Amino acid sequence: SYLFIYKTNLLYADQQSYKLTLLSSTVITFQYITQILVLILFHNYTLYLIVLLVSTFFNNFFASKIADKNYPYLRQMEVSELTTYEKKNIIEDVKSMFIYKSGSVIMNYTDNILISIFVGTIFVGYYSNYLLIITMINTFISIIIRGITGSIGNLIAEEDKARTKDVFYIFTYFFQFIGIICTSCLLFLFNDFINIWIGSEYLLDNATVIIIIVSFYITCINNQNWIFREAGGLYKNVRLVMIIAAIINLILSIIFGYLYGLSGVLVSTLIARLLTLCWYDPLVLSKNLFVEKFKYYLLKQFKYFFILLIVIFMDWLIPYNNVTTFVDFIIKGFFIFINSTFWFLLLNIKNKDQKNMFMKIKYLLNQVLKK
């Protein structure tokens, strides 16, 4: 797929990645539907992976065609030799990225192996049911991330640190909005959905479900850190921290997995992330991109966390009937979503980042209407 996909980097750098959004959404939707049908009809994991492979190929192939259409000069360009300085920088950046990504793989993809060892393969399946929902949410969030990373890179290149800081906190607000609303909805709807979908025998205990949801929340509210770090090319600054996080995760997962099973493995990943990346990433950004006191960022995040607790409490106060059908689930989900959104917006009514966010949305809508 790399023979095709490299061209699409131009679309991201040129802030034209929205042209890939419809393609990505269509392919992902088709992929999920086909994978579900394959598992139901054939119970064959190999076919499941083949669907993933084919979907990835077609997504990258057509994305490449979109890039060719937008930048026809790609077919006519003469290839020139890179300077020694350029090669040195590229090699150094690739080394840093390789170290970081290697740590990321250990950090994010060892849980299932350890769960299988300490608890059993059947619990990997139980956990995967919940993880599938989280993955679907994160997939659509990633589409948003891909669409804005290029514009953030351009912003950083302009070296306007005050503007960079303001935009960073707008995105902090945005991902807190997504994180808080989704967290509250998951807290009150997760087990209901699993129960209706595949049955009560596949439900995990409440403590484990809460750990899964908290992990999702922590990941979501750190998206702006990862976006600005990647756009700013700061892999050198954080590469060793990811390795440290991976080592902490592996050690804790072995200890807690042996003692507490599934919940022990999952909470180990959460602890490792909190002890390293969650505070070090924004610290690096505050020192390198917008020269902001780190405590200001922490104060904002604690305020948002307090808002999360209030939103959850207000959702808990609403009486709900037992959810036995998808209609009941949709009705309950609707009220939780509306109530969560209302309280989040109300509690942020004096937040300048919320005001800036609405101004940005209003500007974009006006631009669309003018066209």
Spans of model-derived segments:
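Transmembrane helical elements of multi-pass membrane transporters/channels
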Residues: 27, 51-63, 67, 83-154, ...
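Interfacial transmembrane-helix starts/ends
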Residues: 91-94, 128, 160-177, 181-189, ...
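Interfacial segments at transmembrane-helix termini and the short loops linking adjacent helices
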Residues: 187-217, 263
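Helix-loop junctions and terminal segments of transmembrane helices
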Residues: 12-13, 72, 134-172, 226-231
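Membrane-proximal transmembrane or re-entrant/amphipathic helices at the cytosolic face
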Residues: 293, 315-371
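Membrane-interface junctions at transmembrane-helix termini in multi-pass inner-membrane proteins
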Residues: 1-24, 46, 213-245, 259
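Hydrophobic alpha-helical transmembrane segments
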Residues: 21-71, 131, 244-248, 262-283, ...
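Interhelical loop/hinge segments that connect adjacent transmembrane helices in multipass membrane
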Residues: 45-49, 61-108, 151-166, 284-302, ...
